[in-house]
Swiss-Prot record:
Chain positions recorded as GTP binding sites: 334-339, 380, 476-479, 1152, 1271
CDD domains: MM_CoA_mut_B12_BD (cd02071)
InterPro entries noted in UniProt: Cbl-dep_enz_cat, Cobalamin-bd, Cobalamin-bd_sf, GTPase/Isobutyryl-CoA_mutase, IcmF, MeMalonylCoA_mutase_a/b_cat, MMCoA_mutase_a_cat, P-loop_NTPase
Domain note: Is composed of four functional domains: the N-terminal 5'-deoxyadenosylcobalamin binding region that is homologous to the small subunit of ICM (IcmB), a middle P-loop GTPase domain (MeaI) that likely acts as a chaperone for ICM, a structured linker region involved in dimer formation, and a C-terminal part that is homologous to the large substrate-binding subunit of ICM (IcmA).
Swiss-Prot/TrEMBL cofactor(s): adenosylcob(III)alamin; Mg(2+)
GO molecular function, one term: GTP binding
HAMAP family in the record: IcmF (MF_02050)
Provenance organism: Paraburkholderia xenovorans (strain LB400)
Name of the featured protein: Fused isobutyryl-CoA mutase
Spans annotated as Disordered: 193-240, 614-667
Binding residues for adenosylcob(III)alamin: 33
């Protein structure tokens, strides 16, 4: 039997009795790369650690606040987006300033954080930055063990000194009282008073330190460019409190003279990057924040029984002085308790004007085997932060530990301490419960039970204890099937349980809610009743700021993104593809049998068995067919040129028509053959007969030296051969040599030539001779710098194919700011664009409406705003050109005509794929529902204004792959997302052929074999589904896609080897006829690529396209046995994944449960484990290692934005805002009203971007569209 009594922890580090290590994990601000940190938090949990995971895109303030309020031992942050020097320094500073000196900071960023920067950050105070070499040396578990050991040592040291201090605080507070919140006198009026009440307390000392120079110096140092990595010596030990040159000289004892000199330089110049307001707001803790920190430490002390009984009794008595209402929220696992809790807190804050102070105690289960716990409620909370008036919400995540129920044994003490602190409201959220659990009820005044509609038969409700005790019941996820019936059944059960038959079931406190929907009226109705009930238990009167909803108890209906009747669309598509393949096999069999019959008849005639026939075979329609077949098959070349389709073409006048001559009637064998031929011909489909009929013509067209197509009395000639130096003629398109009509037809139906349905080999018959598919990604610094890079990349190119990389600040819809964790990322890893003026500068000198100009913009969350800016630039360019040409101002009609012409001609792509952002890349900023609504608005605008040459979305698998997905998952999820957009746009009433041509795709090419056929499978599935299921035209059937070589396959070790990997990935992309291609620079593993490394990356493509011999042929993959086998294997695997997604409610239903994200994380972990144990060989990383690994690597030039560029952006932003300060407020109100009234938001954005900056627009949309809620 298995002993479950004690945890079997992986870590054997000795800790004080009852002590558990607690870690906060997160990805840095404006960083969606959370694959690594997710792996780390999983291993931490399995190693016995309690993990509070915050997810991606977390500011320093959010991480520091969580660490302090959760009383964490360590913080682990991944940073792959640059700005790490500022981020980690600022984090160390904030923790020190707010009383978290003992909290150890760990970090990692692959090769992005170079050794010199690692050394600098560790000298500054970061406990450890793990490098790729550390990972190689220690392995994943080894790195985790090292983190645990370092924190365990700190915990033991703290136990020797810190717990006695906490005990002293507890004793002091038990005598004099905790600094209580006095919300009745308006919290925040006297920010210093609460501290002054206990002048001898540690809180006073920390506040004094925060008001001094320490944090201001830290902000200044952290706000320099990344080149300040060696300036860290200015903060060694207790030196550098003023940031002066003298401080740097003092620091020379801890570092070399060069470091000190750099520190002095930094200290003298960095002040331009900080402001006094930054230091005061971020560094000086407000009184509530100080109370929260001490409260967190006291809760931990009570958990370890470090507080004596006498002190506890005094605190308990103190807690009972004031009646403080307690709300308990419990329910089944996965019911959405955390989201609903957050939405209720949001409504309390809004309704009371943010005057309430609220404590949230969230409990999650511990794992018995390891003792670890994933405390995952905080990641879901959007409404607990500082709204500008100081801290109002304290949250503590608790593990059940040895408790046998859904609550922690420490909950009573935690509630007592929260009461003693004087919160206005305390909310307790339990872990998931079963039918027989109701442990929360005795601890709270009012309880809320959260469930979903999927509870089974109505009889199951009789077994649920909480339906007896709950004050309120919320049926969350009310948009699911059967929700109305569930509401009725639960209400009746509650009525029976209460024996309250004087009221109707509809009057029972049972509510239907959709917590995932922003501003859901069902949640608001629930809030109204909960707040009213809590007022009876001491909740202060007030509120009334929220509009009262109609008298309802459930969420009102809205149009579903994908209508319920269409929710099985992916399974239907899979069935369509399978049916098409079955048809191809069946039709090929018929064609083969028919051809065999014709051949048999021909051979019978030729051998003389029908020699007695006196009628010449040429007079016989059947013989005519046979002779034609004979002519087609007499030589292999002739057989290839004519598959016997002539028989089909003449089937009504030949033997295949079933008409027999008198002579044939005398020959039973020939007559029977004719009958069989007629039957097979009749069974062939019309499309299939046409394919066989036209094949000889196609063969003839491709057999010469030129391919000639006539379009509107104009001939387009394409050379069909390329001569080699040896004199060989290499055909641009090679044809199969099949003779068997079945093989020909099967190949035509499943493969076919490039440019022919199902477009497996490519969507165009030939590549453009004068235009390589090169599209290089560029973006760095300010718009002027990137504009220069664009001109460099496109120099000498007949086509200007620009691909724009935005910095992470822009990617998250924000704008430049002096705050260090923002400032460090401005212009790094992309270009900073905050205003319409920035966009004009970025594309200055390029005619955006010229046929040879195409612009791709890689941006998603704020894509509608950025696209509106881009379209305005294109329109303004054309208006300026037309005005100059006319020599006068344009009339209103001329302006309108010019705008329409610009929109009709502008070419390019905006990524704007919000589904893959939720699943992989994580630059979602708005609620998913709102983002999808605005995507539909963009497409509707395209249809209305005739935008035909611009792609409204680039449905992207690249970022799914970069997050860790294998190639099959990348392809399956990407195609599934594409079909989801199709269903969503159809549901809005758009025609398939109006919007399908505006959809494009974006894939990664890696090293696995499946990448070789990614494009083939994608094109075939899309084409067949578009034609067979949606009835789309040929233009809509063509899937066009961009390829970027794998960033994940670039390694910081043996960095020069990266170009070899990129070359192979580019080769298979070109072989597969991708429509455009980006080749990564070899140094992207550690930095934004330099001009030289980008030139090398471009050269990879040019060498393949212009030098590589086999690339002269444009369908080299066709005819390969392994390519065909892989194509079928990958297609079948994708369709199987479609079925799995369907089982989970389609793409949106699967996203709700985190299915795609979970699969991606599992696949990422498999890759990481196999990379680290060497079973997945990577040359230069885990095999073929250098014989001299410790030699200093050749220094790589690090591309970083400069201080001048950052300051320039700040100045440009403020100048734009000052210029439009009068018009901006009205424009923002107009935008918000458009959202509320369900207008086309993008159409309004086209006007708003002319007077409002990106950050202003983003925050206005947050108010009415909601913020994205992170998933685990």
């Amino acid at each position: 039997m298995t002993d479950l009594s004690t945890p079997q922890r992986a870590g054997s580090h000795k800790l004080p009795a009852g002590r558990r290590l607690r870690f906060v994990t997160a990805a840095a601000l404006f960083d969606g790369h959370d694959a690594s940190i997710n792996i780390m938090r999983r291993i931490l949990q399995a190693s016995g650690v309690e993990v509070i995971h915050l997810g991606h895109n977390r500011s320093v303030d959010e991480v520091a606040t969580a660490a302090l309020h959760e009383d964490a031992d360590g913080v682990a942050v991944s940073s792959y987006q640059g700005g790490h020097n500022e981020y980690f320094r600022y984090l160390v500073d904030l923790l020190r300033a707010r009383g978290g000196e003992r909290i150890k900071v760990f970090g990692g960023g692959g090769g992005v954080i170079v050794p010199e920067e690692i050394a600098g950050l560790e000298r500054y105070g970061v406990e450890k930055i793990y490098s790729p070499q550390d990972g190689q040396r220690l392995g994943l578990q080894g790195m985790i063990d090292d983190m645990i050991a370092r924190c365990a040592e700190g915990a033991r040291a703290a136990a020797a000194t810190g717990e006695s201090q906490v005990g002293a605080w507890a004793a002091e507070f038990s005598e004099h009282g905790l600094p209580r919140f006095d919300s009745r006198d308006d919290v925040g009026v006297d920010r210093q008073g609460a501290v002054a009440r206990n002048p001898s307390s540690e809180a006073s000392r920390v506040a004094a330190a925060g008001r001094g120079d320490h944090l201001d110096r830290g902000v200044r140092a952290a706000s320099t460019a990344d080149t300040a990595d060696t300036a860290n010596t200015a903060n060694t030990a207790n030196t550098a409190n003023t940031g002066s040159v003298a401080d740097a000289a003092d620091a020379a004892d801890a570092a070399d003279a060069a470091d000190a000199a750099d520190a002095a330089s930094t200290a003298s110049t960095a002040s331009t990057a900080s402001t006094a307001s930054t230091a005061s707001t971020a560094g000086i803790p407000d009184p509530a924040s100080l109370v929260f920190r001490r409260l967190a430490q006291l809760i931990s002390a009570f958990e370890t029984a470090a507080i004596d009984v006498n002190t506890r009794d005094k605190l308990s008595a103190l807690a009972e002085v004031t009646a403080i209402p307690l709300l308990g929220i419990t329910g089944t696992g996965g019911a959405g308790k955390s989201s609903l809790t957050d939405e209720l807190i949001r409504r309390f804050r809004l309704d009371y004007g943010d005057a309430l102070t609220i404590a949230v105690l969230a409990i999650d289960p511990s794992r018995r085997k390891s003792g670890g716990a994933l405390l995952g409620d905080r990641i879901r909370m959007n409404a607990i932060g500082d709204w500008g008036g100081g801290a109002r919400v304290y949250m503590r995540s608790m593990a059940t530990r040895e408790a046998s129920s859904e609550i922690s044994d420490s909950l009573p003490d935690a509630l007592m301490l929260c009461k003693a602190a004087g919160f206005d409201l305390i909310v307790v959220e339990t872990s998931g419960i079963g039918q027989g659990n109701a442990a929360i009820v005795p601890f709270v005044d009012e309880s809320l039970y959260v469930m979903t509609p999927e509870f089974g038969a109505a009889s199951q409700l009789e077994k649920i204890d909480m339906l007896d005790f709950a004050s309120f019941v919320a049926i969350n996820k009310f948009d699911r099937k059967g929700a109305r019936d569930a509401l009725r059944d639960v209400a009746k059960q509650v009525q029976r349980n209460r024996a309250d038959f004087a009221k109707s079931p509809e009057a029972m406190p049972v509510f239907g809610t959709i917590a995932s929907r922003f501003n859901d009226d069902g949640v608001t109705a629930l809030y109204r009743h909960v707040a009213e009930a809590l007022r009876k238990h001491g909740l202060r009167s007030g509120g009334g700021r929220l509009a009262a909803p109609e008298d309802l108890r459930f969420s009102s209906g809205r149009n579903a993104i994908v209508p319920p009747a269409r929710v099985r669309y992916l399974a239907d598509i899979a069935q369509t593809i399978h049916a098409y393949r079955e048809r191809a096999d069946a039709q090929a069999r018929l064609a083969r049998e028919r051809w065999q019959l014709i051949e048999a008849r021909r051979m019978l005639v030729e051998t003389g068995e029908a020699a007695r026939s006196t009628v010449a075979t040429s007079a016989s329609p059947g013989a005519s067919a046979s002779s034609k077949a004979n002519a087609c098959t007499s030589t292999s070349s002739k057989a290839n040129a004519s598959p016997g389709a002539n028989t089909t073409a003449n089937s009504n006048a030949s033997a295949t028509s079933g008409t027999a001559t008198p002579t044939d009637a005398l020959n039973p064998t020939l007559s029977q053959l004719d009958t069989l031929i007629t039957q097979r011909t009749a069974s062939l489909g019309e499309r299939e007969r046409i394919l066989l009929d036209t094949w000889p013509e196609i063969v003839a067209a491709y057999s010469g030296t030129e391919h000639i197509v006539r379009v509107r009395d104009r001939e387009i000639r394409t050379a069909l051969t390329v001569a080699t130096l040896s004199g060989s003629e290499v055909r641009k398109v090679s044809l199969p040599k099949f003779v068997d009509h079945g093989e020909i037809l099967r190949w035509l139906m499943l493969d076919n030539l490039p440019g022919y349905f199902p477009f497996t080999a490519g969507v165009f018959p030939f590549r453009r001779e004068n235009e390589d598919p090169t599209r290089m990604f560029a973006g760095e610094g300010d718009p002027q710098r990137t504009n220069r890079r664009f001109k460099l990349l496109s120099e000498g190119m007949p086509a200007k194919r620009l691909s724009t990389a935005f910095d992470s600040v822009t990617l998250y819809g924000e704008e430049p700011h002096e705050r260090p964790d923002i400032y460090g990322k401005v212009g790094n890893s992309g270009v900073s664009v905050a205003t319409l003026d920035d966009m004009k500068t970025l594309y200055d000198g390029f005619d955006l409406c010229a046929p040879e100009t195409s612009v791709s913009m890689t941006i998603n969350g704020p894509a509608p705003t950025i696209l509106a800016m881009f379209f305005n630039v294109a329109i303004d360019q054309q208006i300026a050109r037309t005005t100059q040409r006319q020599g006068r101002p344009l009339t209103e009609d001329e302006l309108a005509a010019t705008r329409r012409t610009a929109l009709e001609n502008v070419r390019g792509t905006v990524q704007a794929d919000i589904l893959k952002e939720d699943q992989g890349q994580n630059t979602c900023i708005f609620s998913t529902e709102f983002s999808l609504k605005v995507m539909g608005d963009i497409q509707a605008y395209f249809v209305e204004h005739g935008v035909r040459n611009f792609y409204s979305v680039s449905i992207s698998g690249y970022h799914i792959a970069e997050a860790g997905a294998n190639p099959i998952s990348q392809l399956a999820y990407t195609l599934a997302n594409g079909f989801t957009y199709v269903e969503a746009y159809l549901a809005r009433g758009m025609s398939i052929d109006d919007f399908a041509p505006n959809l494009s795709f974006f894939f990664s090419n890696g090293m696995d074999p499946e990448y070789t056929v990614l494009g083939r499978v994608a094109r075939r599935i899309w084409a067949v589904a578009m034609r067979e299921r949606y009835g789309a035209n040929e233009r809509s059937q063509k899937l066009k896609y961009h390829v970027q070589t794998s960033g994940r396959s670039l390694h910081a070790q043996e960095i020069d080897f990266n170009d070899i990997r990129t070359t192979l990935q580019a080769l298979i992309a070109i072989y597969d006829n991708c429509n455009s291609l980006h080749t990564n620079a070899f140094d992207e593993a550690i930095t934004t690529p330099t001009e030289e490394s980008v030139r090398r990356a471009v050269a990879i493509q040019l060498i393949i396209n212009r030098e590589w011999g086999l690339a002269k042929n444009q369908n080299p993959n066709q005819g390969s046995f392994v390519i065909e086998e892989l194509t079928d294997l990958v297609e079948e695997a994708v369709l199987a994944e479609f079925d799995r997604l369907t089982e989970r409610g389609g793409v949106l239903g699967a996203m709700e449960t985190g299915y795609q994200r979970g699969r991606i994380q599992d696949e990422s972990m498999l890759y990481e484990h196999r990379k680290h144990d060497g079973s997945y060989p990577i040359v230069g990383v885990n095999t073929f290692l250098s014989a001299h690994p410790h030699e200093a690597p050749q220094p790589i030039a690090l591309a970083r934005s400069t201080d001048d560029e950052k300051q320039s952006q700040l100045q440009r932003l403020r100048a734009f805002q000052a210029q439009h300060r009068d018009a901006a407020p009205a424009a923002l109100e107009r935008l918000k009203r458009a959202v509320i009234d369900d207008e086309n938001v993008f159409a309004v954005l086209m006007d708003v971007v002319r007077v409002c900056s990106l950050g202003q627009i983003t925050h206005a949309l947050f108010e009415v569209g909601g913020q994205y809620r992170r998933n685990m």
